Amino acid sequence: MRPEIAVLDIQGQYRVYTEFYRADAAENTIILINGSLATTASFAQTVRNLHPQFNVVLFDQPYSGKSKPHNRQERLISKETEAHILLELIEHFQADHVMSFSWGGASTLLALAHQPRYVKKAVVSSFSPVINEPMRDYLDRGCQYLAACDRYQVGNLVNDTIGKHLPSLFKRFNYRHVSSLDSHEYAQMHFHINQVLEHDLERALQGARNINIPVLFINGERDEYTTVEDARQFSKHVGRSQFSVIRDAGHFLDMENKTACENTRNVMLGFLKPTVREPRQRYQPVQQGQHAFAI
């Protein structure tokens, strides 16, 4: 399953690496939005869950992954800017659906508040309108380690917290990925954490009141950081919100085990294609280079 690769110019300011997994029989296209500093490799399992029922689009933010060499990294990028990049990609690919993971949910909600004309449904996974105590501790420690450029501590942070339920092989890839990032990527992550702690999430929630499409919020039963109970508070902000719980899953959902993978896939397809029963996809273990890092 080889994607069509393109590097797109976004309003003359950024160049964004994209992968388009075309499915000839698919009628709809979905864009996947990852957490900060995660790359297209993080969505390998999700692509297998959604393709070939959908055309699937992956992309790297200008500061990360395969977009990184195409941009000068002269300035930090806000969640609002990420939202505008997403809107450009939605327009370019004429995407019918979007799906976000973890803190990719902030830019996704900001983009959906603009009511993009093509998008009919959205899935927001492992995200919460509440920064609870475990998440605040995670963000505070992340801010401290990133400011000090402490690669060892940054490399272990995700595995010890939101990634605690991941298979050991995923954790090794996470550590290798995070501890080898460029200094500008650490600065970008530090900037995003400060945005969150300085009420950037509140701005996203205020805009969410403008969202006029169905949005499914998916959270793991074992996730202490974006809990099922906290996620349900999205009903106060998103008018057409729905909620699903993935049993035996933590923050990383379909990456964690076979049962969670199958349950996540069934929930996603049940929401996005409710009239169609799809054949079950086989769960495939992590491949070389795949990581689960997100913030």
Curated annotation (Swiss-Prot):
Keywords: Transferase. The keyword Cytoplasm does not apply. Its EC number is 2.4.1.-. One of its GO terms (molecular function) is transferase activity. Residues 28-254 form the AB hydrolase-1 domain. Pathway: Polyester biosynthesis; polyhydroxyalkanoate biosynthesis. Catalyzes the transfer of the acyl moiety from in vitro synthesized 3-hydroxydecanoyl-CoA to acyl carrier protein. This is (R)-3-hydroxydecanoyl-ACP:CoA transacylase. It comes from Pseudomonas putida (strain ATCC 47054 / DSM 6125 / CFBP 8728 / NCIMB 11950 / KT2440).
